[in-house]
Regions:
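Active-site-adjacent pocket-lining segments in enzyme domains
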Residues: 2-8, 12, 26-35, 54, ...
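Hydrophobic residues within alpha-helices
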Residues: 19-20, 93
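N-terminal beta-loop-helix "entrance" segment that forms/cooperates
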Residues: 34-55
Length: 191
């Protein structure tokens, strides 16, 4: 799947979706926010309604021309992460995207419930919210409690409190020259 795409399902974690969108756009990255439903409105786990840029059915899920700089992004939150994982067309698109050389980024519960749906995870270093690591570990991935981890073509983040660190790791992949500029603009001295 071409481009930088954040996928939203009802019950997504507000900070994990919106901080990533904000940081990437501050870095000059064109981001698509995609609803997995047949409507643009998606409601967060805290009751905030977001209008997505497009719906999954309108997105080009093809893998032709996909590179590591094409990123599928999955925020956590409950029941949002379960809803993402239950969307089989999205999970199949993620598997095809990753197999074609694309990058997958997930935070909080999403590494455990979404990234774990990929096949080739042996030796992958990852982070996630506590108690969501077992499905990845069962596939040979190695948990670390870091705020954000970039391992191969998978980027993971620990929790809402580390959403900006997670977003900066994605930005570092896409345009490393913008990371310090964005950190400075956001007054991030220690992240």
């Amino acid at each position: 799947m071409k481009g930088i795409n954040i996928f939203l399902a009802d019950g997504f974690e507000d900070v994990e979706a919106l901080a990533v969108n904000d940081v990437l756009r501050r870095g000059g990255i064109d981001v698509n926010v995609i609803s997995i439903y047949d409507e643009n409105q998606v409601t967060s786990s805290h009751g905030i309604t977001i209008l997505a840029d497009m719906m999954l059915e309108d997105a080009d899920l093809g893998a032709k021309g996909t590179t590591e700089r094409d990123v599928m992004i999955f925020p956590g939150g409950m029941p949002g992460t379960k809803n993402l994982a239950a969307c089989e067309p999205l999970m199949e698109a993620m598997r095809v995207h990753y197999a074609a050389g694309g990058t997958v980024a997930a935070i909080c519960a999403a590494p455990g419930l979404v990234v774990s749906r990929l096949d080739s995870l042996d030796g992958l270093e990852f982070t996630c919210f506590d108690s969501f690591e077992t499905l990845l570990q069962a596939k040979g991935a190695v948990f670390t409690p870091k705020p954000a981890v970039h391992s191969g073509r998978i980027i993971t983040g620990r929790s809402a409190g580390h959403a900006v660190s997670f977003a900066l790791e994605i930005l570092r992949l896409l345009d490393p020259s913008k990371v310090e500029e964005v950190r400075h603009a956001m007054y991030l001295k220690t992240i």
